């Protein structure tokens, strides 16, 4: 009996080894044909789809290519297919052993690629206004250009940035930007401004990244800026000057960044998950005039049930000096205003930040803009914000100023600032940033109300 079993097993093994393998896909890409109203070049489309001349084609590959184009956010509608009857396509893909070149057809309607819009914000003891130009498909090459300018009570700037989200022929991305900013660094005590420090920052940065998946990217970068710090002014009468790093000089940073983002906003209301990690290091070893390390992590969760869109944003930033040259005053952590509603703009400062923002938006109305086909949402929101920002290294260096008390090791109850309130949003479909946002928040520990109004986010930085 065992001998019969061995013979049967041997016959099965021989049959498996000699059985003809199923035919592989025999349709290959000949060219990409574009139909419809889009100015995206054929070369860019092929790179986005990961389909090049000579690559095999089947229904799974076509479906994956179409999904990649949808995720590019360049099209209002898109379809990827081959111009063959279904039965003929199946025969050539899976049954016929001959090779057939075929045209891959992309039928698409592109989104309007460029925008010019005003930005503004006022309330919480500050105001600013500016304009932004953004183009997410410059000359049809799937590269992005953004430029912005702002004039404000405490911050004015000019900014230009260029980004290639996916290099043709490689899973790479790169970006570069330049910035000029004048800012009054305000320091507060007991819900009132003590002094302000005039500063100027000019420079730029560049990054190169790896596109690990449609939602996942990792970056390495270099930032080079020069900071000028002028003498403090507007010292409040009878106030004791707060310590800060008054050093001017070069800020050279090595950067690492990781991001996972599968959020979407078809109606302008976000859904999905965003994970963000970033580490920046400045050191005199590479000719920087400052020594510090900054680590930031952020988690953003956006949901949807019925007509509600709840969200939760958790953030942690550690910004520690590594020598007596310390952290530049312009890189000091600050919070208040839109990031901690119910308080003055940038009311709190320090080097160890933990914050949370919980919000629920409910769509009340869906209306149409006059004389257009564009619809927008009117939403109401309720929110709770909380944050603690410790100053473990007063003055931003490892050498504490004279007569300074030792900083706390961990947060006490008095170090936690919380607020609650509500607001209204006007939201355009497909645009993540609300066109108009009004929030009224009550700061619990300061027992005060702050109103914040922003148009198009109030600016890009």
Show where each model-derived region lies.
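N-terminal signal peptide c-region/cleavage motif recognized by signal peptidases
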Residues: 18-22
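Short acidic, glycine/proline-rich loop/turn micro-motifs
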Residues: 46, 187-190, 234, 393-397
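C-terminal transmembrane beta-barrel domains of outer membrane proteins
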Residues: 49, 73, 273-461
């Amino acid at each position: 009996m065992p001998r019969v079993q061995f013979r049967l097993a041997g016959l099965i093994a021989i049959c498996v080894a000699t059985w003809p393998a199923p035919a592989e896909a025999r349709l290959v890409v000949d060219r990409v044909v574009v139909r419809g109203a889009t100015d995206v070049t054929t070369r860019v489309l092929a790179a986005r789809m990961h389909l090049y001349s000579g690559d095999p084609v089947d229904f799974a590959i076509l479906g994956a290519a179409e999904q990649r184009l949808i995720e590019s956010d360049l099209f209002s509608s898109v379809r990827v297919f081959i111009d063959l009857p279904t039965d003929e396509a199946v025969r050539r893909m899976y049954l016929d052993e001959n090779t057939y070149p075929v045209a891959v057809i992309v039928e698409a309607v592109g989104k309007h690629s460029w925008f010019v819009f005003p930005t503004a914000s006022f309330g919480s003891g500050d105001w600013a206004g500016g304009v932004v130009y953004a183009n997410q498909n410059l000359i049809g090459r799937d590269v992005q250009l953004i430029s912005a300018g702002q004039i404000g009570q405490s911050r004015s700037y000019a900014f230009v940035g260029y980004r290639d989200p996916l290099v043709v022929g490689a899973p790479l991305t790169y970006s570069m930007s330049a910035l000029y900013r004048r800012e009054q660094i305000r320091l507060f005590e007991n819900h009132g401004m003590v002094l302000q420090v005039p500063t100027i920052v000019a420079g730029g940065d560049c990054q190169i990244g790896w596109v690990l998946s449609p939602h996942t990217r990792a970056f390495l970068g270099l930032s080079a800026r020069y900071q000028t710090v002028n003498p403090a002014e507007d010292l409040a009468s009878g106030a004791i000057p707060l310590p800060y790093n008054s050093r001017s000089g070069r800020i050279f940073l090595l950067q690492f960044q990781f991001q996972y983002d599968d959020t979407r906003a078809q109606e302008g209301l976000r859904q999905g998950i965003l994970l963000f990690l970033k580490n920046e290091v400045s050191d005199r070893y590479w000719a920087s005039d400052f020594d510090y390390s900054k680590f930031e992590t952020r988690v953003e969760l956006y949901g949807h049930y019925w007509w509600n869109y709840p969200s939760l944003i958790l953030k942690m930033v550690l910004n520690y000096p590594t020598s007596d040259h310390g952290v530049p005053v312009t890189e000091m952590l600050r919070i208040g205003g839109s990031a901690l509603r119910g308080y003055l703009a940038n009311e709190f400062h320090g080097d160890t930040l933990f914050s949370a923002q919980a919000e629920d938006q409910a769509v009340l109305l869906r209306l149409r803009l006059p004389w257009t086909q564009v619809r927008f949402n009117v939403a109401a929101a309720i929110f709770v914000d909380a944050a603690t920002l410790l100053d473990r290294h007063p003055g931003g260096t490892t050498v504490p100023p004279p007569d300074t008390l030792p900083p706390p090791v961990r947060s006490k109850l008095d170090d936690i600032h919380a607020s609650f309130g509500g607001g209204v949003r006007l939201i355009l479909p497909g645009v993540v940033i609300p066109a108009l946002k009004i929030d009224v928040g009550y700061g619990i520990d300061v027992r005060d109300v702050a109103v914040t109004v922003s148009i198009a986010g109030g600016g890009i930085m």
